[in-house]
């Protein structure tokens, strides 16, 4: 199901799109972590690193898109009867999105560290290695050099080669892109933090209204209690007055009867 933001305002469709994106981000984070675990092993290759970079950029784009959708979801018009359910749904989406972003950013930081380590190894190998066989790529040999427990190198003073420079430039460019992507995720975290803060203010306002209502109810109960007490006292007073009147009437009747007798 496709969704065009800003058109239609279908909350159910938008919520489904947000949930789908969150699931994709979570799955991509798992795949990125799995790929990171292959770096520095015999499975490492330029193609693997390229795939890793593409997966990171795709996930970063998903995160930006999801952030925009959640903002739009919170601004959709709603009826008073739907407000509570809409808020619960938004809170759940924000919580799930925050969890998926946390895992993704953790993988991003690990990827950046791996790239920095790779650049350092390229620079180091250029200074200590006498060169690599012509039938193998520089990056393949670096992977092999990393995986060996006791690499054998021929120490020579040799200037850095063009291949080394190319690899370094590529990896440094990848590092800069990763750092920019990490900053993008930080901005999204700020947006989510603002949403949570606004929700907290709303909750505080609701709690204040509830407390105010409770105070009013207590005051009303006290007034009702006082009214009931007053009513009971009034009835008691009325009964006493009636009793006194009856007694007086009886006395007067007795006196009149006595005079007649």
Curated annotation (Swiss-Prot):
Residues 165-227 form the t-SNARE coiled-coil homology domain. Signal peptide: none annotated. Residues 2-238 are cytoplasmic. The modification Phosphoserine is found at residues 45, 75, 125-126, 129, 205. Residues 128-148 are annotated as: Disordered. Belongs to the syntaxin family. This is Syntaxin-7.
